[in-house]
Amino acid sequence: MDEQVTLPPVADLTEAGPLKDRFLQAISSGTSLTVDASAVQRVSSPCLQVLVAGKQSFAKAGGASLTITDPSEAFRETASVLGLLDALELGK
């Protein structure tokens, strides 16, 4: 079973907590998540940290996956500056 999470245009600290909670819920129920990052105009490091930790936690738990799709230019640029493209499996 797959579910989708859509990141808002401003994915900052206020989004990080609820996103973490959603990831934990999905991991515990074995639900794979797809994160749509196409609308992001600004993303903060706390939100990216939650996404990286989420990728790692899903991989460690097994049975479900976390995929980030359609990263916006702003999302990709911030992830690149912070050296997180590989950790988020977004390539170069």
Role assignments for model-derived ranges:
Residues M1-P46, V52-K92:
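STAS-like cytosolic regulatory interaction modules
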